[in-house]
Amino acid sequence: MALYLSGDPEADAFLSQDPLALLIGMVLDQQVPLERAFSSPRDLRDRLGGQLDAGAIAAMDPGELAEVFSQRPALHRFPASNAGRVQQLCQIIVSDYGGDAASVWEGASSGTDLLRRVRALPGFGEQKAKIFVALLGKQLGVRPSGWQEVSKPFGDKGTHYSVADITSKESLLRVRAHKAEIKAAAKAKASTA
């Protein structure tokens, strides 16, 4: 199944085919529009000479990688800190998973193990890890025992909470509407407190 996260067919195809690209996109999915976050792995690949390789990124000079992230258009609103986060991610992929990003989920023995593995990666807090587990389960068929339970509420069927639920322009709009409702409710609650 082809992912629909960046709104760019080429970038989405790359995310669908390259597990490292998908992990990097998820790391970058904060404080920027999701389309930018998920098109950035393709742009990073292009800036690195046409290959996205965990070992090569892990071994890069941190300043050089930050420069690559900072080239216009920048790959993120905060290019230097996110270059560091992506480099740390790649270092863990190399040291713990033999350089194979898909091994993060392919080797998971259960949903709990999968969540633990994702949660241990740089840039993945509890909520983002649950969203990524839900994305793997809902869209990529990675469903170790208990994956829906550990990714609640994002793994629930019929929801429009996160990138795990985006499969089309229509579902993207539903996710955005849901996020706007939550933000408005939080703002209303804060103003009455």
Regions found by a protein language model. Give the residues of each.
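C-terminal accessory module of base-excision DNA glycosylases/AP lyases that mediates lesion recognition
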Residues: 1-13, 17, 111-116, 126-193
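Structural motif
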Residues: 11-21, 32-34, 76-81
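Short, aromatic/basic-rich helix-turn unit that serves as a nucleic-acid recognition element
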Residues: 23-27
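Short alpha-helix boundary/capping elements
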Residues: 31-36, 48-49, 94-97, 140-141
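Short Gly/aromatic-enriched secondary-structure transition segments
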Residues: 38-44
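Alpha-helical ds-nucleic-acid-binding substructure associated with the helix-hairpin-helix region
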Residues: 48-119
